């Protein structure tokens, strides 16, 4: 009734917008009728739902004049000719897009978004037959959401004319309620069935639909109430006395279930019932109220959380599992899957509960089927489905067809194909009656083993560059079946020969597995032969294989066999020991070379450090000489042209020019003339320092401040450049760029906002390109108080919906790569990896909407050539970052306990190298980490009891003059 009210309320609004009719109104209406095609169908569907089959004869229906008025109002702003031209252009554009989508689906039928876009465009163009076919194809591959089903049902209801059409709509409703638990679809189903109450068996049909709806979603605490009320209203409308008991029954059933607004339902029952409410009903009602209080925390948690609310649903499921009510457990699983239909673990848990507890064939198989339609890339769901079908006696042909679908599902790992083949082969093996020498089932099993090996070699190995079965598990199982169940050791030996030729001959466990099979089902001769081959080929544990051979000969062999075994084992072990010694010598030589290189680097650093110290010692004398010769500085420069003095802070201020003239010197070199003396240069540098404002950081404003780094050093006026960027996030109070003492921009700054939410929004601008470099935006955190604080905005774990692409050409742009990736699904995000200078590294991360699209993109794009570069595409799974171990004390051999070296925040600087031998080092206090730059090196105690007095610069100058 709400829909009818909304429809009738919109009519006067449309009339008021239409206004008086003009002379050219008929042309305008004709031009606008196509524009309102979709809207009129939607209104018709909603009106049909509310009014029943005879809606077009009622006064409240949407008449053609109403539609004309709406069309006139819609087209009042433009002339007929202009609108017709715009519409033709839009229609042509839509047709091209429809053709593109159809072609894309012919290539990849599992592209979910292409299906949705095609249905939307076909519906917009009014292609009713085509849109019905498109929906049918999509529903065969994917489960449809509640919105897609309701849209489809409304369109079909609007076109239904007779009883046959009504049966077709009933069939659609039956399919719709099987995909997900949808209270709204059940409500629509019940209301639509009421419209057919006049047909034969109509009343029973309505009651059947409502009863099934209550069984499915009647326990839904927040949405089940609407179904109960709709059912009661229907029964109340039937005024026969015999029907009153049915209404009583509905009230009593509803009041015994914990639902929201139970008090209002109880009050309504008291008002409706002429007789006093029975005591048993009141007791059930009070019990339901108590249960409601237990469920409320979980329901409120769902209301407060945002979709998909997986954690809240998991907690709710755990609670229901403890109570153990199968109906409520099934309901909460179904509710969780509506929002988390792409979570394989949730489907596995649900199907596992049904397999072990309920064991109802139709229910179990239905859930398994829905699971593989939602998550076709998860091999565990397929293997569980095969087991469930076998458990419930499904026909062999159906199971085989399901297995073929699994092979085309697009698994993301080679091992997944091995697992699904294993599940299918196990099923085929259980069908065989091995008491018979030959049977159809046995031949089918052998053919399946042969096909599995060919499939893994041709299909899987070409796609993933690996078979997924390095240990040849499938061939081992086949060999066991032939040996133990078929008594065919000849075939088993052939299989094991093939296993060994695939790189497994060097492993002792493989030979021992073969030996045990021969021991159980073969003969001594073949056992001895297998062990002799194992002794010659095994490289990982040859001693163990030799021991097994000697043990067998000790119990079963002759003297000659014993002598041969001893000779072979001794020869083999001697060769193995020789190889190990050579490998150890080679390893030792490499270690020695590394130590020599390290020693050379250490000496070079020591020499460099000593030279640096000498220069520091000569510093005071040089400065003194410079001060004494300031007046004759120009003459000294001419007399000693080989000496070059460092001019500090010689960068001129803005608007000034440097007063330096350059003249050609001897041998083509340039000699500077008319250069200011150092005293004037120092004065200029001091003035520059005074001009640079000191930046004082207020730590109390860290929550509204962000730290911006990796900016170009050449950026002029950072405040003016950055302010427009960050004002998009909110009001900027201040931008504090950091300059060096010479006035150079240091590439980072602080941006202070007025509100905290603006600062949080600014963090999303991290890695935004500014003058060709990625700008880093991070929270403002005092690292002296939080030394371990790090911000990495990207996940470092397995993300099945995200791809990692390597080998890209450096010239490939984001737009070009996005255009390539769009062909395989909806791209939510694409990130080209760059260095700090903004140069591409040939790597990229592409995030798709779901795991299915990502797996399809891997299969299609891996090995693709882009601008003569062959790219590699894989599911994003970054390696674990190395976490520095906690420092531990270590003890030198024969010496004192040594504390671990402590370095600053920037690692190990060259000036921290200690030239004191480790044996003489004493443990000292660990130096604190510095905020910027390395921490001070730990002090080393001198051998003397008292510390020597510090020497001044003059003392060092005297020592230097004594030389």
UniProtKB/Swiss-Prot annotation:
Region (Mediates interaction with PRPF3): 2-351
Comp. bias (Basic residues): 620-635
The keyword RNA-binding belongs to this UniProt entry's keyword annotation: yes
Region (Necessary and sufficient for U6 snRNA binding): 537-953
Residues modified to Phosphothreonine: 657
GO molecular function: histone binding; U6 snRNA binding; U6atac snRNA binding
Organism domain of life: Eukaryota
Chain ranges of the RRM domain: 704-782, 801-878
Main location class: nucleus
Pfam (any one): RRM_1
Signal peptide: none
Endoplasmic reticulum is among the record's keywords: no
SUPFAM superfamilies, alphabetized: RNA-binding domain, RBD, TPR-like
Omega-N-methylarginine: residues bearing it: 906
Function: U6 snRNP-binding protein that functions as a recycling factor of the splicing machinery. Promotes the initial reassembly of U4 and U6 snRNPs following their ejection from the spliceosome during its maturation. Also binds U6atac snRNPs and may function as a recycling factor for U4atac/U6atac spliceosomal snRNP, an initial step in the assembly of U12-type spliceosomal complex. The U12-type spliceosomal complex plays a role in the splicing of introns with non-canonical splice sites. May also function as a substrate-targeting factor for deubiquitinases like USP4 and USP15.
The protein's name in its UniProt record: Spliceosome associated factor 3, U4/U6 recycling protein
Organism the protein comes from: Pongo abelii (Sumatran orangutan)
Classification lineage: Eukaryota, Metazoa, Chordata, Craniata, Vertebrata
């Amino acid at each position: 009734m709400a829909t009818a009210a909304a429809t009738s309320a919109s009519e006067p609004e449309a009339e008021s917008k239409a206004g008086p009719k003009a002379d050219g109104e008929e042309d305008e209406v004709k031009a606008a009728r196509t524009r309102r095609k979709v809207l009129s169908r939607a209104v018709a569907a909603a009106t049909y739902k509310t009014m029943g089959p005879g809606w077009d004869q009622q006064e409240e229906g949407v008449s053609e004049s109403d539609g004309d008025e709406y069309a006139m109002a819609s087209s009042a702003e433009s002339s007929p000719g202009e609108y017709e031209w715009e519409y033709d252009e839009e229609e042509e554009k839509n047709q091209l897009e429809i053709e593109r989508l159809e072609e894309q689906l012919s290539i990849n039928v599992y592209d979910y978004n292409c299906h949705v876009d095609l249905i939307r465009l076909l519906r917009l163009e009014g292609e009713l037959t085509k849109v019905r076919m498109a929906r049918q194809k999509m529903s065969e591959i994917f489960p449809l959401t509640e919105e897609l089903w309701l849209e489809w049902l409304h369109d079909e209801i609007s076109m239904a004319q007779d009883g046959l059409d009504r049966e077709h709509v009933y069939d659609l409703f039956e399919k719709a309620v099987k995909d997900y638990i949808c209270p709204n679809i059940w409500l629509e189903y019940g209301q639509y069935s009421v419209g057919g109450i006049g047909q034969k068996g109509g009343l029973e049909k309505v009651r059947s639909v409502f009863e099934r709806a209550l069984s499915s979603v009647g326990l839904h605490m927040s949405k089940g109430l609407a179904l109960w009320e709709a059912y009661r209203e229907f029964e109340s409308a039937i005024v026969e006395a015999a029907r009153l008991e049915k209404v009583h029954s509905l009230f009593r059933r509803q009041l015994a279930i914990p639902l929201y607004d139970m008090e209002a339902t109880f009050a309504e029952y008291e008002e409706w019932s002429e007789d006093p409410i029975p005591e048993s009903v009141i007791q059930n009602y009070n019990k339901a109220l108590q249960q409601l209080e237990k469920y409320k925390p979980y329901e409120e948690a769902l209301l407060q959380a945002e979709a998909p609310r997986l954690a809240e649903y998991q907690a709710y499921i755990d609670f229901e599992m403890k109570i153990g009510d199968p109906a409520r457990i099934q309901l909460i699983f179904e509710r969780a899957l509506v929002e988390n239909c792409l979570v394989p673990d949730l489907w596995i848990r649900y199907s596992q509960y049904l397999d072990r507890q309920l064991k109802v064939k139709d229910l179990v198989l239905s859930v398994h089927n829905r699971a593989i339609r939602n998550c076709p890339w998860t091999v565990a769901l397929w293997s569980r489905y095969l087991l469930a079908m076998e458990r419930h006696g499904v026909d062999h042909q159906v199971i085989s067809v399901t297995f073929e679908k699994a092979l085309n599902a697009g698994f993301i790992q080679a091992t997944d194909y091995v697992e699904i083949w294993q599940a299918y082969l196990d099923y085929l093996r259980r069908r065989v009656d091995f008491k018979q020498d030959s049977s159809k089932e046995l031949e089918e099993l052998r053919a399946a083993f042969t096909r599995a090996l060919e499939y893994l070699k041709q299909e899987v190995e070409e796609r993933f560059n690996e078979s997924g079965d390095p240990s040849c598990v499938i061939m081992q199982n086949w060999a066991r079946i032939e040996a133990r169940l078929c008594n065919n050791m000849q075939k088993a030996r052939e299989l094991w020969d093939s296993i060994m030729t695939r790189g497994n001959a060097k492993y002792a466990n493989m030979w021992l597995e073969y030996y045990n099979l021969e021991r159980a089902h073969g003969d001594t001769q073949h056992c001895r032969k297998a062990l002799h081959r194992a002794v010659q080929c095994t490289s990982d544990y040859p001693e163990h294989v030799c021991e097994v051979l000697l043990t067998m000969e000790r119990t079963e062999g002759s003297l000659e066999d014993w002598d041969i075994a001893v000779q072979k084992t001794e020869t083999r072990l001697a060769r193995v020991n020789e190889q190990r010694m050579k490998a150890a010598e080679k390893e030792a030589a490499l270690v020695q070379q590394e130590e020599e290189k390290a020693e050379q680097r250490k000496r070079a650093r020591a020499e460099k450090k000593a030279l640096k110290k000498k220069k520091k010692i000569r510093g005071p004398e040089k400065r003194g000489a410079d001060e004494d010769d300031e007046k004759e500085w120009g003459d000294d420069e001419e007399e000693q042209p080989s000496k070059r003095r460092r001019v500090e802070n010689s960068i001129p201020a803005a608007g000034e020019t440097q007063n330096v003239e350059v003249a050609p010197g001897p041998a083509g070199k340039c000699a500077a003339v008319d250069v200011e003396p150092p005293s004037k240069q120092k004065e200029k540098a001091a003035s520059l320092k005074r001009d640079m404002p000191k930046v004082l950081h207020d730590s109390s404003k860290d929550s509204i401040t962000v730290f911006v780094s990796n900016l170009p050093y050449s950026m002029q006026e950072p405040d003016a450049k950055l302010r427009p960027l960050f004002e998009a996030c909110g009001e900027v109070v201040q931008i504090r760029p950091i300059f060096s003492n010479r006035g150079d921009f240091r590439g980072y700054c602080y941006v202070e906002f007025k509100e905290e939410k603006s600062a949080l929004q600014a963090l999303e601008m991290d890695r935004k390109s500014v003058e060709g470099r990625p700008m880093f935006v991070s929270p403002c955190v005092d690292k002296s108080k939080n030394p371990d604080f790090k911000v990495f905005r990207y996940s470092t774990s397995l993300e099945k919906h995200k791809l990692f692409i390597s080998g890209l050409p450096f010239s490939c742009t984001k737009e070009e790569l996005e255009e390539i990736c769009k062909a395989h699904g909806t791209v939510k995000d694409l990130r080209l990896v760059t260095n700090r200078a903004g140069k591409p590294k040939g790597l990229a991360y592409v995030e798709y909407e779901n795991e299915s699209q990502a797996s399809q993109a891997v299969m299609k794009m891996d090995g693709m050539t882009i601008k003569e570069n062959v790219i590699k595409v894989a599911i994003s799974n970054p390696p674990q970052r190395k976490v520095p171990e906690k420092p531990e004390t270590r003890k030198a051999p024969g010496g004192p306990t040594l504390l671990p070296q402590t370095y600053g925040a920037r690692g190990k600087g060259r000036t921290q190298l200690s030239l004191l031998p480790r044996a003489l080092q004493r443990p000292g206090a660990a130096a604190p980490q510095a905020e910027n730059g390395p921490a001070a090196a730990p002090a080393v105690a001198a051998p003397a009891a008292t510390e020597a007095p510090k020497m001044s610069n003059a003392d060092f100058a005297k020592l230097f003059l004594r030389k």
